[in-house]
Amino acid sequence: MNDFWQHCSALLERELTPQQYVTWIKPLAPVAFDAAANTLSIAAPNRFKLDWVKSQFSGRISDLARDFWNAPIEVQFVLDPKVGQRSAAGAAPLAPRAPLPAANPAPVTAGPAPSGAADANAPAPAGMNAATAAAVAAVAAAQAAQAAQANAAALNADEAADLDLPSLTAHEAAAGRRTWRPGAASANSEAADSMYERSKLNPVLTFDNFVTGKANQLARAAAIQVADNPGISYNPLFLYGGVGLGKTHLIHAIGNQLLLDKPGARIRYIHAEQYVSDVVKAYQRKAFDDFKRYYHSLDLLLIDDIQFFSGKSRTQEEFFYAFEALVANKAQVIITSDTYPKEISGIDDRLISRFDSGLTVAIEPPELEMRVAILMRKAQSEGVSLSEDVAFFVAKHLRSNVRELEGALRKILAYSKFHGREITIELTKEALKDLLTVQNRQISVENIQKTVADFYNIKVADMYSKKRPANIARPRQIAMYLAKELTQKSLPEIGELFGGRDHTTVLHAVRKIADERGKDAQLNHELHVLEQTLKG
């Protein structure tokens, strides 16, 4: 077991960057191997590392284990805080990498260290490679920051915990003002863990595992731009869309990317309900100074589901002040909601105008190809081979959001494992029988016709009539498009339900609306509202 892990670690060290290896792989350790069951247990020191390694590296480690033992090995990940302590005590060194080009790290700007502290800018001793030099420099910078603790602006840790406000230590405050150097963040694994815990980020949600399609490509492009240029591009960034479409994934991805690029950045992800709770507690304990000091000092604020601010005037007032302070300091604000900013009821006009001052992007329900890709990617991450036929069948019948797709896949995998059967379309139909019945019953062409007619203030009878004025023909085409997108009806069946129209008429309407949706923001918004209404 230990021989395998030394072999595996050596290979991964060569494949990954120094930062990735030291942060994610080096803290791991094998703790058990069951030859009879062909299972290998690998321990991680905390939940963050466990979740990240499981999602990002389990496949590669399983492949290496299979090659090493010439048999399929199930790799299991377990939590063991003592692993980090053993790792810190010093493991046997692995085979060295090939020499790296000399680094040219930027100077540390945390302020001069007092006498006796290590000099972060001192030249590396002769013979020290770039990765080691970067690590030494990072440790020196941390020592300098700790020495300057008396001068750092931070919250009292006890007061912060009372309000769910992680304390900002002097080390973090100084690190937030440093220019990042590749590899430096990995010098202190515990510090990296602390950053994740304080930020409340989920390290599993990254750009790498975010499936992109037409429905979300603009949102992803904007998110990457913001991650690369926080506080400069699109401030605030406002993402809106229905439940389970990837809004939360994207904003965590921005935070994770910034934390990798600037490990000392002061980042906070918070759900709007928790922010409301913090405001209430601050009011009850007369701790608004602490509250403001914390939120106004962030480099990146990620606030999810801001529609929960509706009707809460004091919360909105405090958020307005925080927003103004952050934007003035070139800090980035990212917000999500289930609807377009101007359609959120009970929100102060001042806030709505601030939301509109940046970039507002909709995330739509995933199209068919994207749904197939999501299922294939998720199955792969679970170590399961899913045929395209099965993925296509599921994607064709479940259209609303990513969570629904992932939930369906979990049902299929569990059903397959329980019955000991291969995953086929027949098994999938059995596993999803109840879900498919509900889906087929939920949305009918008749319901679509009525909803669209009400939305555009025309009569339902106009959907079947031969009238062709624009105020009737356009909604009728939209209803045909939605019927094709949201039901299992064929083109001829849809045409029959629209007054006996030919299937080519329906096809023309579907193509016309689909094409215009990508070009016309107003039409896209109207379709989004109709889809959400029909899906309840």
UniProtKB/Swiss-Prot annotation:
One of its GO terms (cellular component) is cytoplasm. Residues 105-121 have a biased composition (Low complexity). SMART domains: AAA, Bac_DnaA_C. InterPro entries: AAA+_ATPase, Chromosome_initiator_DnaA, Chromosome_initiator_DnaA-like, Chromosome_initiator_DnaA_CS, DnaA_C, DnaA_dom, DnaA_N_dom, DnaA_N_sf. It holds the Pfam family Bac_DnaA. The keyword Hydrolase does not apply. GO terms for molecular function: ATP binding; ATP hydrolysis activity; DNA replication origin binding; lipid binding. It is found in: Cytoplasm. Residues 72-199 are annotated as: Domain II. Residues 1-72 are annotated as: Domain I, interacts with DnaA modulators. Residues 417-536 are annotated as: Domain IV, binds dsDNA. Residues 97-121 are annotated as: Disordered. ATP binds at residues 244, 246-248. Plays an essential role in the initiation and regulation of chromosomal replication. ATP-DnaA binds to the origin of replication (oriC) to initiate formation of the DNA replication initiation complex once per cell cycle. Binds the DnaA box (a 9 base pair repeat at the origin) and separates the double-stranded (ds)DNA. Forms a right-handed helical filament on oriC DNA; dsDNA binds to the exterior of the filament while single-stranded (ss)DNA is stabiized in the filament's interior. HAMAP family: DnaA_bact. Domain I is involved in oligomerization and binding regulators, domain II is flexibile and of varying length in different bacteria, domain III forms the AAA+ region, while domain IV binds dsDNA. PANTHER family: CHROMOSOMAL REPLICATION INITIATOR PROTEIN DNAA. NCBIfam families: DnaA. Belongs to the DnaA family. This is Chromosomal replication initiator protein DnaA. It comes from Burkholderia thailandensis (strain ATCC 700388 / DSM 13276 / CCUG 48851 / CIP 106301 / E264).
